[in-house]
Amino acid sequence: MIVAKKYFLVLSFLFVQFALLPQAFSADKGWFDTLKDNVSETWQQPEHYDLYVPAITWHARFAYDKEKTDRYNERPWGAGFGQSRWDDKGNWHGLYIMAFKDSFNKWEPIGGYGWEKTWRPLADENFHMGLGFTAGATARDNWKYIPVPVLLPLASIGYGPATFQMTYIPGTYNNGNVYFAWMRFQF
C-alpha cells in the first residue's frame, strides 16, 4: 500500500510538471527556443533582484525509516540571490543561485531558471499564487559535489514582494521525497 501511494505521489507531481510545461512556452516557437528566449530576457532585462532565504526541508515520513528522519537536518540555513521579471501574461520568470545546509547538514548549492503561471484571485492584486517548474543543477556532498541536473515542480503563495515558494523532490524509499521551501523577497 505504501509503495502504491509513493508511486501515485511521484506520478502526480510529474503529471503537474509536464501539464504546465506547454504554458511556459509560446505556441509559435519550439519549446527550446522559447525557453532560451525567456532565460535570455530574464538575464538581460530583469525587473527585480531577489533574496532567497531557505525555510524548511521536510522528509516525507511515509517514505523514510524513523532512525533516518531523526538524524536529518530539516532546518536548512543559507541564502541565495536571483533576478526576476513578470511577463506580459503576469507569469513569473527567475534566475537564481542558492546555497543551504542539506539533510546531512552539508552545504548544497543549487541554481537555475524558474517559471510560474501566476494567479491573482483576490481583488487585492498584491496577493498571488503560482504553479510552475524549475530547471537547473545542484551538487551534494554525498555525491562528491558532481553537478546533477534538476527538473522540479514549483508552487508559491505571496503578497507583494514577499513570496513563500516551494518544491517537492520525488524519490524512492529512504531517498528523496523531500518538501523544500524558502522565502523569496523581491527588490
UniProtKB/Swiss-Prot annotation:
Gene source species: Citrobacter koseri (strain ATCC BAA-895 / CDC 4225-83 / SGSC4696)
Entry keywords, A to Z: Acyltransferase, Cell outer membrane, Membrane, Signal, Transferase
HAMAP family reported for this sequence: PagP_transferase (MF_00837)
One cellular component term from this protein's GO annotations in UniProt: cell outer membrane
Protein name per UniProt: Lipid A acyltransferase PagP
Record-level GO BP terms: lipid A biosynthetic process
Endpoints of the signal sequence: 1-26
Catalytic residues, chain numbering: 59, 102, 103
Major localization class: membrane
Location within or outside the cell: Cell outer membrane
Subunit structure: Homodimer.
GO MF, one annotated term: acyltransferase activity
Reactions performed catalytically: a lipid A + a 1,2-diacyl-sn-glycero-3-phosphocholine = a hepta-acyl lipid A + a 2-acyl-sn-glycero-3-phosphocholine; a lipid IVA + a 1,2-diacyl-sn-glycero-3-phosphocholine = a lipid IVB + a 2-acyl-sn-glycero-3-phosphocholine; a lipid IIA + a 1,2-diacyl-sn-glycero-3-phosphocholine = a lipid IIB + a 2-acyl-sn-glycero-3-phosphocholine
Species lineage: Bacteria, Pseudomonadati, Pseudomonadota, Gammaproteobacteria, Enterobacterales
Physiological role: Transfers a fatty acid residue from the sn-1 position of a phospholipid to the N-linked hydroxyfatty acid chain on the proximal unit of lipid A or its precursors.
Disulphide-bonded residues: none
Domain of life according to the entry: Bacteria
Site feature location: Role in the phospholipid gating: 173
Family: Belongs to the lipid A palmitoyltransferase family.
